[in-house]
Amino acid sequence: MGEIKVSPDYNWFRGTVPLKKIIVDDDDSKIWSLYDAGPRSIRCPLIFLPPVSGTADVFFRQILALTGWGYRVIALQYPVYWDHLEFCDGFRKLLDHLQLDKVHLFGASLGGFLAQKFAEYTHKSPRVHSLILCNSFSDTSIFNQTWTANSFWLMPAFMLKKIVLGNFSSGPVDPMMADAIDFMVDRLESLGQSELASRLTLNCQNSYVEPHKIRDIPVTIMDVFGQSALSTEAKEEMYKLYPNARRAHLKTGGNFPYLCRSAEVNLYVQIHLLQFHGTKYAAIDPSMVSAEELEVQKGSLGISQEEQ
């Protein structure tokens, strides 16, 4: 149990990439926690937004791999925000504080929904250059819990954890998926009552994405064919909403492919970001491009051969 937590990679990550804490709101209790790794000269980095159960370090495998290729990557953990507008306003202030005009966003589950809402919120003065949406959704009504959204704040932590764990895979899983679930359960345990209640509120509060406001943003939809908390209907809805999106399908990986299928996820992220190389919105150090592009081409060739 807990293989990932004691792995050399995770411990090296925790030992070398500092966790920063930043306050951008008038309320001092609203603290953003983040890992910012890779070349600071990059002004349009890739930012990772976690699911309900996740902390910033659930993306450590993306941070290690992508910074090794010359990308600047930031992984975040949200403060306690109770509605989407409050989140979007806080996130905008955070980007201002970090002096980032535009960013690429990778959002997992709730993180993907919030990424879309932020793109929508800033559509008149765009801050989002592209989106990677992993196991994500565009309408909170799919969870059939909009009626309970206003009562999460009253529930004790153990009850909230039970709600979240109910969405974790309960069927047979391979060892890597089992390790990923163990790690996410451990991360879930580290979250306090207000953190969990606020995230569940954001996840279930009645809201949907207005696609006409963000239709010009390049999107990659990343989803898992096997078991995941998302219904087929929710996935189909995403395809309809973004008809021009690139699709990155993983055969297996459950709810947390960034942990248990990290090589595939990292490759799809690189393929998505390739389209911005050579522009001012590149997330990579220009001197690293040629070597990195060759590797991506080799990797994508391998994936397409496997699928045939």
Swiss-Prot record:
Interacts with CD4. Interacts with ALDH16A1. It is found in: Cytoplasm. The lineage of its organism: Eukaryota, Metazoa, Chordata, Craniata, Vertebrata. It comes from Pongo abelii. The modification Phosphoserine is found at residue 304. The keyword Phosphoprotein applies. The keyword Cytoplasm applies. Belongs to the AB hydrolase superfamily. May play a role as a negative regulatory factor in CD4-dependent T-cell activation. Keywords: Cytoplasm, Phosphoprotein. One of its GO terms (cellular component) is trans-Golgi network transport vesicle. This is Maspardin. Residues 87-159 form the AB hydrolase-1 domain. GO terms for molecular function: CD4 receptor binding. Its main location: cytoplasm. Pfam families: Abhydrolase_1.
